[in-house]
Amino acid sequence: MTTDNIDHIAQVVDDFLPLAFQLEIQKTIESLPWYWVDTVALFPADRYADSSAAFEDPRVSDAFAFTHIAFAEGRPQSQYYEFFRSILRFLEAKLDIQVVEMLRIRLRLTPQYPGHKEGMFNAPHVDIGTVNSFKTLVYYVNDSDGDTYIFNRRYDSSNPPVILNKNEPDLQAIFTNTPKQGSGVYFDGRYYHAGNSPINYKSRCIINFDFVIKEQHDL
């Protein structure tokens, strides 16, 4: 699903990685250390959010997931950082962009979640609450269901939180995309978005990149 004028917010980047590299990523992920988190949107920088409050929106499934952080807080957090960072070099070539600052790389493995139904999504959030302008790439490691959602609200640093846990009746999806191995969604990271839990597949695995590109850096 898309709406008019969405191109300046988000775009699907199909098959931008060679198949051999796609398979190498899948093989590497099998040997990673994974860490359980009880809600998929949270990470240490989310101290700006009231993460203790229950999610009031009935569309939100507060599912758990497994994560692996490759880069955060200005430095590599994993021995696999350079391997996963190389994914962005293919994106740079495909879209003719230049990444000048890395903000975060996080892998997320989401299994099925009891009670999760069609039309639901995980917590709406932005990944970074301390940077005025940045891009996000959600790379799909495997084919799955559990669409990526982008919503009609942009983060306002004067009015946090980075996670929306209140009932937001005016919050509507302006873009959704179904996970396809080797492809991804590239978008303005200031827009609230949400991952998802699979229903028909055993798992949904993505690599989430947040970064600044040259044009943004020069502003």
Write out the residue ranges for each language-model feature.
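Non-heme Fe(II)/2-oxoglutarate
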Residues: T2-Q98
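Catalytic core of non-heme Fe(II) oxygenases with the double-stranded beta-helix
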Residues: Q77, Y81-L219
